[in-house]
Amino acid sequence: MCMDDEKEIYWVGSSYKDLLEFPEQAKHDVGYQLHRVQNGLNPEDWKPFQTIGSGVKEIRISDGGNIFRVMYIAKFREKIYVLHSFQKKTQKTSRKDIDIARVRYKAIINREKNHE
């Protein structure tokens, strides 16, 4: 995939504003990983997050002992939707963070269905 074929990133809800709260190095790392996704590659550290919905993936970033996550969906031809950006406080992803991502995922799926 060449640079002209990069998928465009769409930030859902407060996902971009929340990302801006990350420390500088974590923001840089997320940017690099999303650039990989834009060019058809997987992030270097990720996992599928099917409990949110089909095709949802989670970028995993560690910075100075802190853990950050960015949930996104890239299964659409020209778009990447960033559903949620957050700092993880415990080993398990919180119900609140899962619910935020799930609501945003459902909104995106409905929007995409209506624009086919």
Task: Walk through the language-model features, giving the residues of each.
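Basic, Lys/Arg-enriched alpha-helical interface segments
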Residues: M1-I67, F76-K79, Q87-E116
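Conserved Hanks-type protein kinase catalytic core
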Residues: I73
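ATP-dependent carboxylate-activation loops
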Residues: L83
